[in-house]
Swiss-Prot record:
Residues 1-303 are annotated as: Disordered. GO terms for cellular component: nucleolus. Pfam families: AATF-Che1 (PF13339), TRAUB (PF08164). Belongs to the AATF family. This is Protein bfr2. The keyword Nucleus applies. Residues 16-32 have a biased composition (Basic and acidic residues). Residues 33-45, 87-128, 136-153, 195-222, 229-247, 254-298 have a biased composition (Acidic residues). The gene is bfr2. One of its GO terms (biological process) is maturation of SSU-rRNA from tricistronic rRNA transcript (SSU-rRNA, 5.8S rRNA, LSU-rRNA). InterPro entries: AATF, AATF/Bfr2, AATF_C.
Length: 636
């Protein structure tokens, strides 16, 4: 790119970057007239000025150019002229040009020097900074400067690869232990004599001195900037020869201790070499065996763990299955108990009519034509019922109770001619042992279900102190006042309606357990109508259920208001309906005329049509009035 060296070129370059504002075109602006029309324009301007004197000057339209936001005084800066800007730009360009010219002169001088000498000039080795020149190259670093102060901690534990005796051998697995044992194996150097050790130390000292001399020579070569590659190769060869000599001395050191000949030494060396190879092979085999043994042990452990887990799962499943079976058996037992209770309650409800009939026997008078046959049939049915109840009752008793009650001999059924005293003795013989068994069963189950009866209502509690006493003791306390209970059972209520209608206070020939019967019915209704009542709360009764139902909101379609839905009632379909058929011989007009002239009176039906027809008939009859000439019934 060419350089602009003159002021004119700088201004031209600066003008290239100037942004010129775009000029808006105003269609309302009038074109500018020439100089020839100046005289005429003055006259026209006077006229226009007179016509536009009442105009008010307004600002420019904001639609064309928006006004700039007004800033405060803190945003105001110093005004700079364009001349000052151009002068500052010219000074900057002049400085850049001077720098470029100096660089060009330096390059030209370098090219001229190379062309004259024909080779590159090197800096003075005494004054040159070699470290700066070789800062990017891979120069050798002395061992003293290789590590810093911060690297001392981890460098203490660091060991080079191939070292025979590490400071802290890691013992993480069997493989690592085996490697440590291999490294600790004695070598030929361990069996060398003291003289050989001294010779080795002297050789090592000589080698160290030679190495130091080599390092000094290399440092001098680096300072001069010349590296003799051949000298380095010879030094490397000498170092390798020294190492080979040391290895040979180490391997051939065992012959001086034993005092054997050179042949024995050769045999020993061959034997030791073979032994080392054999030991290496054995070590590899041992490593493989150890690895295979470790894999087998892991597989065995995993198999044992799987077996134990499977056994534990089986035990857990068996325990859960047993618990589930026990719960299922309990549920089945509870359902069977509830079913038995419901069946007994159903039997009691059905016996209510029979009890009412039995209580009304004494109030019914015997008719004159009373026959014995129906009475005998009822007696036979009662005896049969008693035998059935007795057999069912005996079936619930265990064998021990039956033996005590004298059930070893075969029981005979009661017949019609069996006296009442014998029937009573049979009942007492069975009631004694059965009472003891019944009390044991009540005690057993009352203790088991005592915790579940905490939510029992007051009506169902037999006593307020039932929580501290057993069920049998509570029943005994209730039966102590037997006279009160007997009197209450002989008072006529719902089970003796005939005596209750006659307002009899007490009757010895009846049995009325209306209180207990009402309690059973109430429990049944509560069981059917109760929802899921919370523990500790009373069970909902029928009355409460009715009140709850009354409080619930009715299901009403609230979107059907304001005519948004059509309200209609679907009528039932008409069945066996036949529409009447018109089988009359008279026409409707004749029927209307007949009823209109009935009893000598003319009834006006459809006045307009009647007048029009009357006028037509008058015209047809030649102006004679039809009504006057017509026949009228019952005319006087």
């Amino acid at each position: 790119m060419p350089l602009y060296t003159t002021k004119k070129s700088n201004k031209l370059r600066a003008s290239m970057f100037d942004e010129k504002p775009a000029k808006d075109y105003d269609p309302e602006a009038e074109p500018r007239d020439g100089d020839d029309d100046q005289s005429g324009s003055e006259a026209d301007s006077d006229v226009e000025r007179a016509e536009t004197e009442h105009y008010v000057t307004v600002g420019k339209s904001k639609l064309r150019k928006a006004e700039a936001p007004t800033l405060g005084p803190e945003y105001s800066g110093t005004r700079v002229s364009r001349k000052a800007l151009e002068e500052s730009d010219e000074e900057d360009f002049e400085d850049e040009e001077e720098d470029d010219e100096e660089d060009d002169d330096d390059e030209d001088d370098l090219e001229d020097g190379e062309s004259e000498t024909g080779s590159e000039e090197f800096a003075d080795p005494d004054t040159a900074d070699l470290e700066r020149d070789h800062i990017d190259e891979d120069a050798e670093i002395s061992s003293d400067n290789a590590l810093g102060e911060d690297d001392a901690d981890w460098a203490e534990k660091f060991t080079f690869r191939g070292s025979s005796k590490p400071k802290t051998p890691a013992k993480t697995s069997k493989k690592d232990d085996l490697a440590v044992r291999i490294k600790k194996r004695p070598t030929a150097a361990d069996f060398m004599s003291g003289s050989e050790d001294d010779e080795e130390e002297e050789d090592d000292e000589e080698d160290l001195e030679e190495d130091e001399e080599d390092e000094e020579d290399s440092e001098e070569g680096e300072q001069n900037g010349l590296f003799d590659m051949e000298a380095e190769e010879t030094e490397d060869d000498e170092g390798e020869d020294d190492e080979e000599e040391l290895d040979g001395a180490l391997l051939s050191g065992s012959d001086d201790e034993e005092g054997d000949s050179e042949e024995d030494d050769e045999d020993d060396e061959e034997g030791s070499g073979d032994e080392d190879e054999d030991e290496d092979d054995e070590d590899e085999d041992e490593d493989e065996d150890d690895e295979s043994g470790d894999d087998d042990e892991k597989n065995d452990v995993n198999a044992e763990l799987r077996k134990i887990m499977a056994e534990d799962e089986k035990k857990i499943v068996s325990t859960f299955s047993k618990a589930a079976e026990a719960d299922a058996q309990k549920g089945v037992a509870v359902r069977s108990q509830r079913r038995i209770f419901d069946s007994i309650l159903n039997l009691r409800i059905r016996l209510q009519k029979a009890l009412i009939a039995a209580n009304t026997f004494n109030c019914v008078e015997k008719p004159e034509n009373f026959k014995e046959k129906p009475y005998e049939a009822a007696e036979e049915a009662a005896v049969k019922l008693w035998n059935t109840i007795d057999s069912v009752r005996n079936s619930f008793l265990p064998e021990q109770v039956k033996a005590k009650a004298g059930e070893k001999r075969k029981r005979d059924a009661i017949e019609l001619d069996t006296p009442a005293q014998e029937i009573w003795e049979v009942l007492e013989a069975v009631e004694g042992p059965a009472n003891k068994y019944r009390r044991q069963v009540l005690d057993k189950w009352s203790t088991r279900v005592r915790s579940t009866t905490a939510s029992m209502t007051k009506e169902r509690r037999l006593a307020q102190s039932a929580g501290s006493q057993s069920l049998v003791s509570v029943l005994d306390d209730q039966l102590l006042s037997a006279d009160r209970l007997i009197k209450k059972a002989r008072t006529p209520r719902s089970c003796a309606p005939a005596q209750a209608a006659k307002k009899v206070e007490e009757d010895a020939d009846i049995y009325d357990d209306a209180d207990f019967y009402q309690l059973l019915l109430k429990e049944l209704v509560d069981q059917r109508s109760s929802d899921s009542a919370a523990p500790g709360e009373s069970v909902a009764t029928v009355r409460w259920a009715a009140l709850k139902e009354a409080k619930t909101r009715k299901q009403v379609d609230r979107k059907a208001s304001k005519g948004r839905k059509l309200r209609f009632t679907v009528h039932e379909k008409l069945q066996n309906f036949m529409a009447p058929e018109d089988r009359r011989s008279w026409e409707e007009h004749a029927i209307d005329r007949f009823f209109g002239t009935l009893f000598g009176q003319k009834m006006v039906l459809k006045e307009d049509e009647a007048e029009a027809e009357a006028a037509e008939e008058d015209e047809e009859m030649g102006g004679v009035n039809v009504e006057e000439a017509g026949l009228k019934l019952f005319r006087s």
